[in-house]
Amino acid sequence: MNYRKVICIVGPTGVGKSEIAFHLAKRYDGIIINADSRQLYKGVPIITAQPTFEERSLIPHKLYACLDLHEKISAGRWATLAAEQLDSVCHTKIPLLVGGTGLYLRALFDGIVTIPPISTELSLTMEKQAEEKGISFLYNMLKVHDPLYANSIHPNDRQRVLRALTVFYETGKTFTWWHQQVTEAYPATVLRIGIKIPLIELAPLLEKRIDKMFVQGAIKEVITTYKRYFNKDVQNWSGIGYMELLGAIKGEYTFNEAKERWLKNTRSYAKRQLTWFNADKRIIWFCPDQLEDIQKCVENWLS
């Protein structure tokens, strides 16, 4: 099998992944492919920190601003889109996958279970049953439909019990069955470069970036987007920054409070990203200012 060479630049939000990827793409005649769930969406380039028009004119960028906010995306669908991009460029350019959505990269290079989306109506129905009948009742139902999975989790694990039951009622297949349907991994030799700094050092950088987004027009961006999609279901889009600013726009709290919520949620998100990526021992870690070391790593790998 012909394995393509692919570089992944990963790490928490706001650490400088995009800048490093841009430099590497310019140096090694590469192409940048988005691996961030938020940057897939149109209409929110400021609050999702998408590449500028100038950057995109200098280096090819793929899978940025390619979805409307009411469109749903899964790790499996993203992996399909990314594989198509890789197939089209691997023979001419070095592809750099850049982003902080670790599940996307796992789906592409390791394979993933692709469970169809669950209807909102069914989810609400199951939540109501949990409230009215208790999680023990639902766990006993799960033991009837999917005893193997039920025996593998704690009877009081509300989230997993509800998830397994909703999947069964939505698809007619058990969670056990779905976990046996792993997608095929993309055939590639992957260099995984991680960029990180201690969270205590990242926090002020995140605050500075949010301040910059306010200056760039984040409030106007959210107002425009909200008006455009007012009659459409964008509840499934949970982009940090959008919901926090929307609450202030609606008068539920002040813009200073919106900024505080935005920063708090961004810091929590960065922490979750670090937890995810730290668990992957294939990643070679660098600080953002170690550009020369990163270049040496890439050159050794390419040779």
From Swiss-Prot:
Record's keyword annotation contains Magnesium: yes
Keyword tRNA processing part of the UniProt annotation: yes
Function of the molecule: Catalyzes the transfer of a dimethylallyl group onto the adenine at position 37 in tRNAs that read codons beginning with uridine, leading to the formation of N6-(dimethylallyl)adenosine (i(6)A).
Site (described: Interaction with substrate tRNA): 101
Annotated keywords: ATP-binding, Magnesium, Nucleotide-binding, Transferase, tRNA processing
Enzyme Commission (EC) number: 2.5.1.75
PANTHER family: TRNA DIMETHYLALLYLTRANSFERASE
Gene from which this protein is expressed: miaA
Cofactors (names): Mg(2+)
Gene Ontology biological process terms in this record: tRNA modification
Family classification: Belongs to the IPP transferase family.
Descriptive protein name: tRNA dimethylallyltransferase
HAMAP family for this protein: IPP_trans (MF_00185)
